[in-house]
């Protein structure tokens, strides 16, 4: 979504590869808020990532007819940082999470999956493409640069497909190169296992149908 928005603003970027076939974006809600379906969002506070992730959320709420300016009939949008604190501290009823990362941070913080309700954008029909590889359009006029990008995309997709087939080994490579020591084997292996579900089915080509779905979701 942010790439489309940038293009609309006049930034001449083009997609040269789309490793991710499916969306990992979801809303994770506390069950004790009484939320059982999207219609229960009214009157609730929802943490939303910006930097492009707000576009599918706002489109989703528009489709549901739910205002995003607060009030008992709408939702209050909390501009969420890239953490899960608003849910853990009960500042928000729902927060944005990725299937492969922040959701598991909530679980690792001691919250049982049974105490959560999850709404995957993919299941709600409002999924948009994520994590493509982009370049400035003018650069592609350079034959040498174009050749470099062809080889780069081929190598990248070869790596993604290897990681799909060998998630634990891929996670171990990340751990071996973690200079901070902050990453854990459990989290990295779990992340790669979930990411493999999102890259599955992609050969790196931008599927026109997926592109059109993204555009229609945002309109």
Label each region the model flagged.
Residues 1-89, 93-100, 119-121, 126-127:
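Short, glycine-/small- and polar/acidic-enriched structural segments
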Residues 7, 31, 45, 50, ...:
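Sec/Tat-exported extracytoplasmic proteins
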Residues 25-35, 129-146:
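A bilobed periplasmic-binding-protein/Venus flytrap-type ligand-binding module shared by bacterial periplasmic
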Residues 96-97, 126-137, 153-157:
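Active-site-proximal catalytic alpha-helix in oxidoreductases
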Residues 101-102, 123-126, 139-141, 159:
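Short, catalytically relevant binding-site loops at active-site mouths
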Residues 105-123, 127-128:
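Extracytoplasmic/periplasmic substrate-binding proteins
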Residues 141-219:
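Secondary-structure end/capping motifs
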